[in-house]
Amino acid sequence: MAKSHQARKTYRPLIALAAVLALGLVVRVVFLVQLERSELGDVLSLDSRLYYDVAHAISTGGALPPGALSFNPLYPVFLAATFRLFGEGLVAPRIVQLAAGLLTIVLIYLAGLRLVEGPRKGKLSGEATAIIAAATAVLYAQFVLYEGMILASAFEVLFLTASFVLALALDDELAGERPVRLGPRRVPPWGSGLLLGALCGAGALGRPNLFFLLIASLPVWLYLRNRKRRRAHVPALSFLVGAAIVLAPPVAYDAARTGRLVPITTHGGINFYVGNGPGSTGVFLPPADVRSGTSAFLEDARAKAEAETGRGMTEPEVSSYYVHKALSYIGANPGAWLALLGRKLLLFFGQDVSDMPSAFLYERSCSVLRLLLVPFAVIAPLGLCGLVVLFRSGRNRSVVSVFLACALASVLLFYVNVRYRLPAVPVLILTASLAVAWGAREISRKRFTRVAGLAAAAIAIFFLVSHRTFVPVSHSASYAFLGNYYLEHKDQARAADAFAEAYRLDPNRAEAIINYARILREQGRLREAADLYARAYAESPRFPLLAIEYGMVLSHIGRGNEARRLFLEATSASEARERALACRLLAQEALAEGNRGEALLWVKRALENVPGDPQLTAMLKQLESSR
């Protein structure tokens, strides 16, 4: 009987885990089917398109973009591997990512078992915490959504959770409680440290700002945790070796391309500036004359830096320029920056700041997402209360503190959105589950006062951070994203509707104004388009191609002198193609006035910007032959 009772106790949590995983599998299969049937199934965000194009180049033996890496390499490498194995479709990577999501749930369960001591008399049950955490992870819609996107988010969450589980296990090992085992064999601390470093190194290839903080913090934690033992430095050193092995290839690649040390990618500087420079609100809001798409964002940021410095710059120099510019602003405005950090902190634990993809769009065609009913607004307050329970227990405080502090700092140093916050969610789910398990135990003991205090704290935190709007959440960018997708697929009518809705939702955003003006121009409503272009130009005169587009509309409605002035301004644009186009339009204006000599000069100047352009070359020959 005793053995039978013990067997039931052993298998009961495993049966519960199997049920949770079965539910997670069903949810993911339904989501994949709905996504593939949806018109959004083939839609790639700007980041996704960049990764797809890079992966295509890798898988077909093509060349990578020149210079240092301007993208995080983890996901393009994974995508290229799936392209090689299964062809260039989106189903295969999505299946792998959804499987990674199920593995993450298992790891969250294992972390829950490690997080608390039980089951022993007077102690919380680790099994209860683990099952609650796994079930919560299944019911969190953002995990499922991002597992279906062509982005690295699923792997970032996986590597963070795996690192957290291994750090908890290593903490138990160093405390002399439970050794780390691989099957029947014990894994020495140096081996665990090596694997932990490799996991963090792999994570840094997808989310450098988070995992580099862990790579800097965990060796210190390992040394301090082990300092009273002989060879206390061994786990910390093995961690650094593991991280270095994984990070060496991209760092060497960047060094060979630039002649200097670059930590994986070169776009950190502009992101740091956007999150901390003048006008920052704590969310992604690029400067008025910088477009928001990944490639365009980096191109415009570089052009802006070169215009402000008056010299050409490499990618690492551009990144350094924006870091120093942001630090100068912070140094001159320390009070404003501290207030901004406080705002970001509340945003981190509060409202969902949408990124692309947006759950708002996908819930319409993937109804299973609406059935996943545990929002971050519930997880965050309970997670913070769970931290109090954890700290009072005295277990694993340092591990949880390191991981949560690094996850928090990685966002606060830049800006807040759902995708950047996502790797922190497993840790908060675990502490939230700990709070729920603790509350259930206290209720069973009739200690209602303690539970009431915890519940009151959770409600207070909810109303402090989750029930307030710190930044207006607009879906304008989502509709602009859809509009560009429809344009790419030659669906002008739906693109027009999407851009009109984007403008209606945010009539003061430069990109929304310009996109809607383009639709009005295509519809022949030139005077209305001119009015919108005028608004956009007054706000962002250096926005790429804006002066040219505005000038073309003015030319068509008979305001040639104003158009010519705009074209002249565009001849000093940062991009050679834009300068060449402005020169060509000035040549056409000169021809319309019968001034062939001036037209010839403008065509020659255009060719100085784009030597060998076939259309301009033909235009030059025609003008020279008719002289």
Label the model's feature ranges.
Residues 70, 74, 93-100, 132-170, ...:
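Multi-pass, polyprenyl lipid-linked donor-dependent membrane glycosyltransferases
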Residues 108-139, 157-158, 180-185, 394-402:
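Transmembrane-helix signature of polytopic, membrane-embedded enzymes
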Residues 95-120, 162, 166, 381-385:
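Transmembrane-helix motifs of polytopic, lipid-linked glycan transferases
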Residues 3-5, 120-124, 163-195, 221-225, ...:
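Membrane-interface transmembrane helices that cradle and orient dolichyl/undecaprenyl
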Residues 92, 322, 328-329, 336-400:
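Membrane-interface anchor segments at the N-terminal boundary of transmembrane helices
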Residues 263-347:
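Membrane-proximal stem/loop segments at transmembrane-domain junctions that anchor or position
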Residues 35-52, 64-81, 87-91, 261-265, ...:
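Extracytoplasmic catalytic/substrate-binding loops of multi-pass membrane glycan-assembly enzymes
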Residues 73-77, 87-106, 131-134, 146, ...:
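Loop-to-helix entry region of an early transmembrane alpha helix in multi-pass inner-membrane enzymes
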